[in-house]
């Protein structure tokens, strides 16, 4: 079915169409792949390739994304199975809400440390290199390269170790982010920092989850 056909079904029978989409693997796998890709991008490209050290809130955000990956994969096993679908929904909601919470905190810290007014740092809690994950999961010990914070919150500019020789491509990216004093979606204009980009990703997922879950609930109520 093409996009026009899907749009027609959504307009004529929105609830049934949304429920039918949930019973297919595509949406669940799309969520898992999207969040997994963001984790890999943050780790492999920005952390390893560009030497942007992750902070405490950054690894918490990775945890939230990882929860959503697991939820999407569980639901994708059989989206028509109510138990598996419910587990996927709960994990997706939990991950997106938790991700928004950590992203908001990181955004507040980012604005405080980049504010020329020293009073803006008053009351701002600093970052720890010894993270405490939900349920006391020892992720920093299990996978330190992925979940061990080594940077400071709010400061995400590349820090290249002494003696490292960068390729021309690495040098271009590193200089761009160093000049902008951190990660931005559009570095020259300081448009959308990393925390705000994560807020957008989690927020979009949460809105879609609310819509999908609402349609599922209406379908159950109607019988």
Swiss-Prot record:
Periplasmic side stretches: 47-57, 103-197
Lineage top rank: taxon: Bacteria
Cytoplasmic side: 1-25, 79-81, 219-223
GO molecular function, one term: protein-disulfide reductase activity
Gene Ontology process terms (BP): protein folding
Membrane topology note: Multi-pass membrane protein
GO cellular component assignments: plasma membrane
Induction behaviour: Expressed from a tri-cistronic operon that encodes AssT, DsbI and DsbL.
Disulphide linkage map: 55-58, 127-153
Protein keywords: Cell inner membrane, Cell membrane, Disulfide bond, Electron transport, Membrane, Oxidoreductase, Redox-active center, Transmembrane, Transmembrane helix, Transport
Effect of residue 55 to S: Loss of activity
Transmembrane feature ranges: 26-46, 58-78, 82-102, 198-218
Places the protein is found: Cell inner membrane
Pfam families named among the record's database cross-references: DsbB (PF02600)
Subunit organization: Interacts with DsbL.
Family of this protein: Belongs to the DsbB family. DsbI subfamily.
Entries under HAMAP family matching the protein: DsbI
Function according to Swiss-Prot or TrEMBL: Required for disulfide bond formation in some proteins. Part of a redox system composed of DsbI and DsbL that mediates formation of an essential disulfide bond in AssT.
Name of the molecule in the record: Protein-disulfide oxidoreductase DsbI
Species per Swiss-Prot/TrEMBL record: Escherichia coli O6:H1 (strain CFT073 / ATCC 700928 / UPEC)
Organism phylogeny: Bacteria, Pseudomonadati, Pseudomonadota, Gammaproteobacteria, Enterobacterales
């Amino acid at each position: 079915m093409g996009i026009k056909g899907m749009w027609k079904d959504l307009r004529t029978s929105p609830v049934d169409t949304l429920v039918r989409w949930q019973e297919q693997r595509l949406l669940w796998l799309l969520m898992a792949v999207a969040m997994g890709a963001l984790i890999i991008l943050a780790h492999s490209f920005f952390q390893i390739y560009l030497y942007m050290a992750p902070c405490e809130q950054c690894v918490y955000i990775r945890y939230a994304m990882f929860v959503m990956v697991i939820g999407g994969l569980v639901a994708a096993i059989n989206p028509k199975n109510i138990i598996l679908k419910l587990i996927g929904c709960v994990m997706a909601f939990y991950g997106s809400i938790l991700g928004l919470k950590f992203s908001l905190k990181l955004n507040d810290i980012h604005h405080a440390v980049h504010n020329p007014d020293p009073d803006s740092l008053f009351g701002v809690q600093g970052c720890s290199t010894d993270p405490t994950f939900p349920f006391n999961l020892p992720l920093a010990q299990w996978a330190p390269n992925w979940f061990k914070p080594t940077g400071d919150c709010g400061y995400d500019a590349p820090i290249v170790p002494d003696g490292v020789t960068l390729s021309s491509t690495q040098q271009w990216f590193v200089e761009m982010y160093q000049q902008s004093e951190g990660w931005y979606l559009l570095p020259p204009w300081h448009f959308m920092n990393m925390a705000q980009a994560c807020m957008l990703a989690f927020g979009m997922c949460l809105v879609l989850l609310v819509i999908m879950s609402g349609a599922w609930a209406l379908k159950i109520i109607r019988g």
